[in-house]
Amino acid sequence: VVSPLLEDYIRNNYPKYKLTSSTCKRITDPKALEEELGRDYHIVVVDYDFNNNWEVLEKLPRKKDCELLVNACCEPNCPRRSAHYRCIGVQQIAYNEHIKKYKNLPFDAAKYDPENFRNCPYSQRGIFDIRGLRTHITPDDIWNKYVPMGFEQFKIEGRTASPLNVLETYMYYMAKPECRDEARFTLLKTLENTGALIFK
């Protein structure tokens, strides 16, 4: 959750529901992050500007309840990220309303993007473009630094990314380097055989 109104509603009406503190809150102050971890959230998604910031990460309580976004495409310290998150929220609400009323008409997200976030150059970055960012967490870092420190939850971004970028990201994070080529081929072949991927 990011909205206090929604959080209060869930806490009052569904007191056993497990709440996640969203990265959309953009908690960038280390003290505020520690305070957030002191509340009764099931998971706190850490702002990825803290990725690889060992001085802050080592001091965090409840590391096992922190979730880290490993492959952020956004520019570190982006001043527009909060506004972009709000825009995405507005678009999601508009989309839900649209499909209730107009099931067979396509949704035009541009109508709900007055700040033109859909053309943000960073949102088009792929797995090969982001590896140089200071916020990027490599598979080796996960196993050799984060897990030994007590972190257990890692999240891969990609809901709105190109399917081919998602595929390559999965290969990077979830397949051993020596198995990636075969895993990639097997997945692509399966997608082709099922009609999910069509080559023209």
Task: Indicate where each model-derived feature is located.
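Active-site pocket-lining/capping segments in soluble small-molecule metabolic enzymes
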Residues: V1-A32, E36, Y41-K200
